[in-house]
């Protein structure tokens, strides 16, 4: 810069300063664009995962309501049909934990794809089953590998911060619940057609193949070896709900497993999975799993004789009861959307929210048992839809908070196994309680919920999420 033909020496620092400011502005703008791009990518990833949950339950719920009718049409007696139905639950009982451990070892992407494809094979075989033996054989792949939702929840726990986790899992449950509402409608329509069950099973197979394709084309990020913790490759410029996008792909593989992955043999991976399971089972989380079992059984007892009880107590036809069940299912799906404001009200204290939702569930089960009119039944069913949906999300979040993210697949797998135990025990308890009264099963459910509340009141150490469990330190 010249003034009267002479260089103004004061302009040099000013010029340097202006240049530095422009560079800083450009850098800030670039970082802001990268952050915005990362936020968009994060939302897209979560929406894809929600769609996976929706398609999974949509496909399954098309077929499952028709299974008992179809196996009967194949010539099975009621006893054989009951054994066939129980076999799926038994397979789930033993496979849930193992598949969860396996997903911690090999990564979420591989395990999720394998589970979806092998489940699809099971439903394809189901559509080809022409006798009871083939029907039972077709249920084996799904019984062992139908853990899409569990692995998806584990993946969600890997990629979102702790405070956002209950909200995101609630939204995932909502998306899955919508699929469970729509699936039976489509399946019921298709089964009216000629060879309707076989057509429905084949369409379910196609839905699972579509789901596998969706997972394959997920916005997974390629990463350099060792660039991530827990095997989640990322780009540092991306952010997922406040956490680095380093945690998006192949979640929850520990550093040791990741480092040795190239040389690890399958039996080594199995040993790692079993060791994780042993650490979990002997951890200090017994009370959380016991609460999960008791609350799951309480709700199962409520639903176990719902149709029969309303018919005996109030003369309600099964068709009307079906409408009430669909209404409750829709409310349960909506409850996931209400988790955000509720969590903010509780300052993200999942244990307090779980305790209060369990108290509400216990009270409503008792109200339903003593309901003098259908109005009281509808009221209790409405509120139960909210309390049980919130409780399921909170107990899952509490497991993950206490157990630590490194074993999220194992944690969710063990939780599913605990629920499977409830599915085996609840029908037996329901049958005994129903011998006394149609109100017996829900009354027993209220008692079990009360025991769970008592256990939660005695064990409040988990509320801080300090990670005292043994898994946290692994």
From Swiss-Prot:
Chain intervals with Basic and acidic residues compositional bias: 19-30
Record's bilayer topology term: Multi-pass membrane protein
GO MF entry, a single one: transmembrane transporter activity
Record-linked InterPro entries: MFS, MFS_dom, MFS_trans_sf, Sugar_transporter_CS, Tet-R_TetA/multi-R_MdtG-like
Any one annotated GO CC term: membrane
TM region positions: 45-65, 80-100, 116-136, 167-187, 197-217, 288-308, 323-343, 359-379, 436-456
Region (Disordered): 1-33
Result after altering residue 84 to A: In a breast cancer sample; somatic mutation
Main location: membrane
Superkingdom of origin: Eukaryota
Record keywords, A-Z: Membrane, Transmembrane, Transmembrane helix, Transport
Gene3D superfamilies per the UniProt record, alphabetical: MFS general substrate transporter like domains
UniProt cross-references to SUPFAM superfamilies, sorted A to Z: MFS general substrate transporter
Subcellular localization(s) per the UniProt record: Membrane
Coiled-coil regions listed in the entry: none
Family note: Belongs to the major facilitator superfamily.
Protein name (Swiss-Prot/TrEMBL): Major facilitator superfamily domain-containing protein 9
Native organism: Homo sapiens (Human)
């Amino acid at each position: 810069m010249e003034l009267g033909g002479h260089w103004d020496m004061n302009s040099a620092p000013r010029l340097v300063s202006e240049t530095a400011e422009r560079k800083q502005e450009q850098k800030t703008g670039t970082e802001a664009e990268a952050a915005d791009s990362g936020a968009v990518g994060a939302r897209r990833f979560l929406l894809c995962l929600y769609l996976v949950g929706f398609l999974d339950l949509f496909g399954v719920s098309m077929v499952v309501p028709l299974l008992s009718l179809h196996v009967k049409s194949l010539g099975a007696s009621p006893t054989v049909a009951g054994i066939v139905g129980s076999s799926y639950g038994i397979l789930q009982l033993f496979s849930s934990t193992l598949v969860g451990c396996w997903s911690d070892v090999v990564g979420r992407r591989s395990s999720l794809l394998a589970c979806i494809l092998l489940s699809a094979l099971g439903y394809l075989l189901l559509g080809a089953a022409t006798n009871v033996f083939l029907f039972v054989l077709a249920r084996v792949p799904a019984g062992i590998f139908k853990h899409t939702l569990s692995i998806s929840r584990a993946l969600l726990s890997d990629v979102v911060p702790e405070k956002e986790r209950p909200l995101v899992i609630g939204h995932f449950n909502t998306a899955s619940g919508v699929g469970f509402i729509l699936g039976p409608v489509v399946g019921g329509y298709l089964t009216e057609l000629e060879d309707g069950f076989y057509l429905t099973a084949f369409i379910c197979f196609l839905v699972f193949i579509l789901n596998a394709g969706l997972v394959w084309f997920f916005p997974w990020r390629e990463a350099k070896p060792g660039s991530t913790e827990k095997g989640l490759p990322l780009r540092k410029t991306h952010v997922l709900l406040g956490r680095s996008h380093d945690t998006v792909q192949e979640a929850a593989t520990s550093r040791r497993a990741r480092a040795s992955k190239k040389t690890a043999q399958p039996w080594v991976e199995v040993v790692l999975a079993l060791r994780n399971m042993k650490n979990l089972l002997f951890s200090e989380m017994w009370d959380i799993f016991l609460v999960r079992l008791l609350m799951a059984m309480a709700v199962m007892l409520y639903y176990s004789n719902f149709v029969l009880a309303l018919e005996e107590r109030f003369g309600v036809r099964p068709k009307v009861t079906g409408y009430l069940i669909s209404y409750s299912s829709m409310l349960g799906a909506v409850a996931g959307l209400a988790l955000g404001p509720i969590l903010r009200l509780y300052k993200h204290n999942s244990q307090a929210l779980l305790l209060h939702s369990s108290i509400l569930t216990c009270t409503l089960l008792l109200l339903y048992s003593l309901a003098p009119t259908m109005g009281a039944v509808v009221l209790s069913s409405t509120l139960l839809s909210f309390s049980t949906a919130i409780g399921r999300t909170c107990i899952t979040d509490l497991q993950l908070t206490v157990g630590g993210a490194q074993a999220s697949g194992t944690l969710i797998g063990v939780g599913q196994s605990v629920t499977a135990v409830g599915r085996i025990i609840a029908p037996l308890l329901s049958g005994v309680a129903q011998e006394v009264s149609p109100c017996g099963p829900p009354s027993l459910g209220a008692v079990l919920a009360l025991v769970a509340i008592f256990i939660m009141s005695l064990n409040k150490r988990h509320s801080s999420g300090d990670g005292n469990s043994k898994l946290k330190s692994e």
